[in-house]
Design a protein with these regions (language model features):
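Sec-exported extracytoplasmic/periplasmic mature domains
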Residues: 76, 80, 98, 111, ...
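Surface-exposed binding/hinge segments that line
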Residues: 105, 124, 135-202
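N-terminal lobe/hinge region of extracytoplasmic solute-binding protein
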Residues: 46-97, 221
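Short, low-complexity disordered leader/linker segments with a strong preference
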Residues: 1-42, 56
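Extracytoplasmic/secreted proteins, especially bacterial periplasmic and envelope-associated proteins
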Residues: 66-70, 80, 84, 88, ...
Length: 258
């Protein structure tokens, strides 16, 4: 199981940096990794090449993953030591006896960076987007264990209501798999399954489109421990602490510069 977890995280980027980001949220960084600017704790990370984008459902690169890890959070998150799935946006979940139905409880305190409350519908919308044949997301297969997800993604099924995802109520997200999948929770640690903000996606007509302006700093809405502050192409991307993050009290850094 641990080998699979490592492979899943490596698919989404650099494992070591993912750990560094996780630890930076709950601990002070080591000297040399951070700099103080006006009394603020800023972590500086050399991030390699310029980003394709920071849309979690369309990108595939390591540099993108590093930034997305700071800006978004999925239903579950990897434990920094064991790599096992632990609660993220979902505070808890149950699994049916036949191992095919997962029921996630979305935190009442979970919010988007603009203050909007998160709900189960955010995940229904976001998973519909990544499975959209028109979007053509490279990592759509991460959700293929879900009932009828592959058929919808490949265009052989047109009715998304037949896909095994459902908002049972505002804070209850139910997922039905086509067969028992022991590693399903591990798949949910991949950034492609992270939620995107429905109103923002719709405002910029990004449901089936790539490269729209929703990921610009003035438009961006995420749900992670940090929010997008500045993006100077080919120079630097800066994120700052998201005070609307449900667990912001453990975020020791004021920002990260990539």
């Amino acid at each position: 199981m641990k080998k699979f977890l490592k492979k899943t995280l490596q698919l989404s980027g650099n494992l070591g940096l993912a750990f560094a980001l996780l630890f930076s949220l709950s601990n002070c960084t080591k000297s040399g990794n951070s700099a103080s600017a006006n009394g603020k704790k800023i972590l500086r990370i050399g991030n390699g090449s310029e980003l394709q984008d920071i849309d979690p459902q369309t990108v595939t690169g390591v540099p993108e993953h590093n930034v997305i890890s700071a800006l978004f959070e999925g239903l579950v998150a990897p434990h920094p030591e064991t790599l096992e799935p632990q609660p993220g946006v979902a505070e808890s979940w149950t699994i049916s006896k036949d191992q095919k139905i997962y029921t996630f409880k979305i935190r009442e305190t979970a919010k988007w960076s603009n203050g909007d409350k998160m709900s189960a519908d955010d995940f229904v919308f976001s998973w519909k987007r990544i499975l959209s044949p028109k979007l053509g997301a490279e990592y759509s297969y991460m959700l293929f264990p879900v009932k009828n997800a592959e058929e919808y993604s490949k265009g052989t099924l047109k009715d998304f209501s037949q896909v095994g995802v459902k908002a049972k109520d505002a804070q209850t997200f139910e997922v039905t798999l086509k067969a028992p999948t022991p590693y399903f929770l591990a798949l949910l640690m991949h950034y492609s399954t992270f939620p995107v903000h429905k109103a923002t996606i719709e405002k910029f007509n990004a449901m089936d489109s790539r490269g729209t302006k929703w990921t610009r700093p003035e438009n961006f809405v995420g749900n992670g421990p940090f929010k997008l502050a500045k993006w100077d192409l080919n120079k630097v991307l800066t994120v700052e602490k998201n005070t609307n993050y449900w667990n912001n009290q453990i975020t020791k850094l004021d920002g990260i510069s990539f």
